Amino acid sequence: MKYTISYKYPHKHFIDIDLLIEDIHQETVQLQLPAWRPGRYELSNFAKNIQRFEVFNEKGQSLKFKKISRERWEIESQGNTKITVKYNYYAAQMDAGGCWLDENQVYINFIGCMMYVPGREYEACTVKMEVPKDYQIACGLPKKGNTLMASDFYHLADSPLIASPSLIHKSYKTDKNQFTIWIQGEVNPDWQMILADFKKFTEEQIKVFGEFPEEDYHFLYQILPY
């Protein structure tokens, strides 16, 4: 799965998402938008934020589709082995599981806005972020330039992102792991105290559990004025 995220009018809160699907060998392709998110055991209605949905082949010709449930679409491939799905997502929910877009930042929980092909969840995913040059990108996924790489859809779903020109960050290390603290918002942090406290609880948790599963881990914080 190859995703591209862009936007034209950030004050309107609409994110443009393109999804390139390759190696299609069926007459129809289904796309699913999740109705769940990590750490929350209840159904969500992320599909209400989909404002536009279009499908094209490599020649730019429109393909037929229909919505078969609240979170699922079915596309007629018409013999095409490669298609591009384009849709808008309304990103105006600033909380631990939402997405937000304005003139100052892009905040994304991929689980709420990224569609996938059922049965192909374990394929590698890339996400190209088309953001201004002065934006930093905070995310736990490995990246090359502005392209993020996930081993599969579940890896992507577990990796929230903030992109902004005003992000600040500091890093610290344990014996085998590196940790980065990212902060978005108007704040003047006491980095010396924060790094000391984070390192203490990190080392204690690793001691208790015996290991930490990630070599590189990122904490993301939104400091809000309300």
What does each of the following model-derived ranges do?
Residues 1-10:
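N-terminal, polar/Ser/Thr-rich
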Residues 45-51, 56, 61-201, 207-215:
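Non-catalytic architectural context of zinc metalloproteases
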Residues 225-226:
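Catalytic zinc-binding patch centered on the HExxH motif and its immediate surroundings
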Residues 218:
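Active-site acid/base region of carbohydrate-active enzymes
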Residues 11-13, 25-27, 67-71:
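Ser/Thr- and Asn-enriched, surface-exposed coil loops between beta-strands
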Residues 15, 20-47, 115-132:
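Surface-exposed beta-strand/loop patches in extracellular or lumenal glycoproteins
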